């Protein structure tokens, strides 16, 4: 989502609060909870899940392994839920032609660098760079090349933009910033 005027362009960045992340966190939580229940029921010899008899799974080695997978899955699920709660990766890119300043803001993990705020002068922007890798794991990324700073990604790699959409966005941004486009 973005907002534009004649001299200001604001690009809002979706962080980790995406539907796919909610689905993965929920599925992982339920699956790991199931593994932990099966491991616990095999240890105690009681039937917590009525799909099968607890005597069918011996605690050593199957019950131990299932308990381990359940605990590991719960930790990963907890990590996913925390990133969703903190909305890691969200923020905005603000391009202001009047002031000649570019501001990039992202939310990070809690701590000292929770708020990631970058500021550049527009005259330091060398180019807008598109990196396209086709194949099994296709990757399309839009970078802003800054003099003395290197390349800063503007679009996340997990967003599934087509090559045409990336090119369109790069052309609009390069025209707005009055810088050239590089393709790699």
Curated annotation (Swiss-Prot):
Membrane disposition: Multi-pass membrane protein
Pfam families per UniProt: Ycf4
GO cellular component: chloroplast thylakoid membrane; photosystem I
Location (main, coarse): plastid
Record keyword Phosphoprotein present: no
Keyword tags: Chloroplast, Membrane, Photosynthesis, Plastid, Thylakoid, Transmembrane, Transmembrane helix
Plastid keyword on record: yes
Localization, UniProt: Plastid, Chloroplast thylakoid membrane
Membrane-crossing residue ranges in chain numbering: 22-42, 57-77
Gene Ontology annotations of biological process type: photosynthesis
Family: Belongs to the Ycf4 family.
Function noted in UniProt: Seems to be required for the assembly of the photosystem I complex.
Protein name, per record: Photosystem I assembly protein Ycf4
Species for this entry: Draba nemorosa
């Amino acid at each position: 989502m973005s907002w534009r005027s004649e001299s200001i362009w604001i690009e809002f960045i979706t962080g980790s609060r995406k539907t796919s992340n909610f689905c993965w966190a929920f599925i992982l939580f339920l699956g790991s909870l199931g593994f932990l229940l099966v491991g616990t029921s095999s240890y105690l010899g009681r039937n917590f899940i009525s799909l099968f008899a607890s005597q069918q799974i011996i605690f050593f080695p199957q019950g131990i392994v299932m308990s381990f997978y359940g605990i590991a899955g719960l930790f990963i699920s907890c990590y996913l839920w925390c990133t969703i709660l903190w909305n890691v990766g969200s923020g905005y890119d603000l391009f202001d032609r009047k002031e000649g300043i570019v501001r990039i803001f992202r939310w990070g993990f809690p701590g000292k660098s929770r708020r990631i705020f970058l500021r550049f002068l527009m005259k330091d922007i060398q180019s807008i760079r598109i990196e396209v890798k086709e194949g099994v794991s296709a990757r399309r990324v839009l970078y802003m090349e800054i003099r003395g700073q290197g390349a800063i990604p503007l679009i996340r790699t997990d967003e599934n933009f087509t090559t045409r959409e990336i090119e369109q966005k790069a052309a609009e941004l390069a025209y707005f910033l009055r810088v050239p486009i590089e393709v790699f």
